[in-house]
Amino acid sequence: MVELQDKVAVVTGASSGIGASIAETLANQGVKVVLTGRDESRLAEVAKRIQDNKQAVVETSIVDVTHKEEVTELVEKTKEKFGQIDILVNSAGLMLSSAITEGDVEAWEAMIDVNIKGTLYTINAVLPSMLNQSSGHIINIASISGFEVTKKSTLYSASKAAVHSITQGLEKELAKTGVRVTSISPGMVDTPLSGDTDWGARKKLDPKDIAEAAIYALQQPSHVNVNEVTVRPV
């Protein structure tokens, strides 16, 4: 089991839901956490909640992952502050209900910008330093929707399928470098992103369930890469 104490993590989409829960769980393990998102007040609330419960090292940074220059600045400032980045969690995401036949191009572009480009921008920013230190772990939050498409989820599903493919390809590119990469594909999770979406008789997952999956992947021995995790409600 890998010890996470004093490692440095950047978590995108950390103002609520899965990102906030992963950040809090990492802090519980002694990880120094940089919370990023677009909502300053909600980020501050998450940071306060973490700091109230433990002696945690928590920083916040207002970042829009669709802006490459903001992502680059985030990574550089984090390295200046803490020396390195050991963990990147790509949790920033956007889910809009939009069928192709509706022709809502703005919704499509928004999901592509956040879910695909945002993921690529953060990976691109942290990867050189991770390769230089021969260690690091990138966790990308994908979705069951990347495999199971409904008539209203075509573009969202496509964007999350892309996240899955990016992770699978990156794992092959990073073989023997010491840098690991994991995609976590949750089923329906009780977060602001899912809203009032009907999931039938199944109970929604708690964001903590996804956080525990992330910790499991991170704590594996350095020669083990948990490349893909699927988490479904019972």
Swiss-Prot record:
Top-level EC class: oxidoreductase
Keywords annotated in UniProt: Oxidoreductase
Enzyme nomenclature, EC number: 1.-.-.-
Top-level taxonomic group: Bacteria
Pfam family membership, one: adh_short
The UniProt record lists the keyword tRNA processing: no
Binding site for NADP(+): 10-34
Enzyme active site: Y156 (proton acceptor)
GO terms assigned for molecular function: oxidoreductase activity
Residues the entry annotates as binding substrate: S143
CDD domains according to UniProt: SDR_c (cd05233)
InterPro entries reported in the protein's UniProt record: NAD(P)-bd_dom_sf (IPR036291), SDR_fam (IPR002347)
Family, per entry: Belongs to the short-chain dehydrogenases/reductases (SDR) family.
Protein name (database record): Uncharacterized oxidoreductase SSP0419
Lineage: Bacteria, Bacillati, Bacillota, Bacilli, Bacillales
